[in-house]
C-alpha cells in the first residue's frame, strides 16, 4: 500500500455517513486525505460537479482515476478494488451477497430513519413532532431488534458469523451516536446480542481511531 497515492475523501465533521467510508479506509490501511465541508458547500461548485446529489461523502481515487459518491457505493468499490486478501470480505458468492444485503439494509433502514430524526429535531420545535419522534424512535429500535435476532441466530459474533465484514462496520458510525438519537436508553437490556456486537466492534483499533478523530474535530 506504500506506493499508493492518497485517496481524497470529502466529508462532514459530524455526519456519520462519511465516517463509514473513513472507517473502511482505516481498516484496509489505505492512505487518504480528508477535506471537511459544511452541508451548504456540498450544494455548490466545485463539489456539486463531483456529487450531483450535493451530499457527503464522495471520493477521488487518483490510483484508478475514479470519482465516486454515495457511501455504500464507495464502500463496495473500496472492497472490490483494495480488499484483495479478504480482510473485510468473504470468498463465496453466498457470503458476498449476504454482506451486500446487510450493507443495503444499513443504507435503507438504519441510516435514513436516524437522519430523519436529526433533521426534524433541528427543524421543528419538539412539541410539533411528538408523534413523529415516537414513530422514528420505534423504528430505530425495530432495526436494533432485527440485528439482535439475526446475531442470536448466527451465534455471533458478527453478521456473517465468525468473521467481521465491511457490512458490520457500516453500522458503527450511526450507532456510536445512539445516545444522542435515543437518550436514556440502554439497548443491552432489550437487545443483548446487538449490544455485545456493537461493543466488540467499538474495540477495533480503526473504530477507536475514527472516534478519536471525530471527537477532536467537535
From Swiss-Prot:
It holds the Pfam family GST_N. Disruption phenotype: Does not impair the production of oosporein. It comes from the Eukaryota. Its EC number is 2.5.1.-. It comes from Beauveria bassiana (strain ARSEF 2860). GO terms for molecular function: transferase activity. InterPro entries: Glutathione-S-Trfase_C-like (IPR010987), Glutathione-S-Trfase_C_sf (IPR036282), Glutathione_S-Trfase (IPR040079), Glutathione_S-Trfase_N (IPR004045), GST_C (IPR004046), Thioredoxin-like_sf (IPR036249). Induction: Expression is positively regulated by the oosporein cluster specific regulator OpS3 that binds the promoter at a 5'-CGGA-3' motif. Expression is negatively regulated by the global transcription factor Msn2 that binds the stress-response element 5'-AGGGG-3'. It is an enzyme of class 2 (transferase). Keywords: Transferase, Virulence. Glutathione S-transferase-like protein; part of the gene cluster that mediates the biosynthesis of the bibenzoquinone oosporein, a metabolite required for fungal virulence that acts by evading host immunity to facilitate fungal multiplication in insects. The non-reducing polyketide synthase OpS1 produces orsellinic acid by condensing acetyl-CoA with 3 malonyl-CoA units. Orsellinic acid is then hydroxylated to benzenetriol by the hydroxylase OpS4. The intermediate is oxidized either nonenzymatically to 5,5'-dideoxy-oosporein or enzymatically to benzenetetrol by the oxidoreductase OpS7. Gene3D superfamilies: 1.20.1050.130. Residues 5-86 form the GST N-terminal domain. Pathway: Secondary metabolite biosynthesis. The gene is OpS6. Belongs to the GST superfamily. This is Glutathione S-transferase-like protein OpS6.
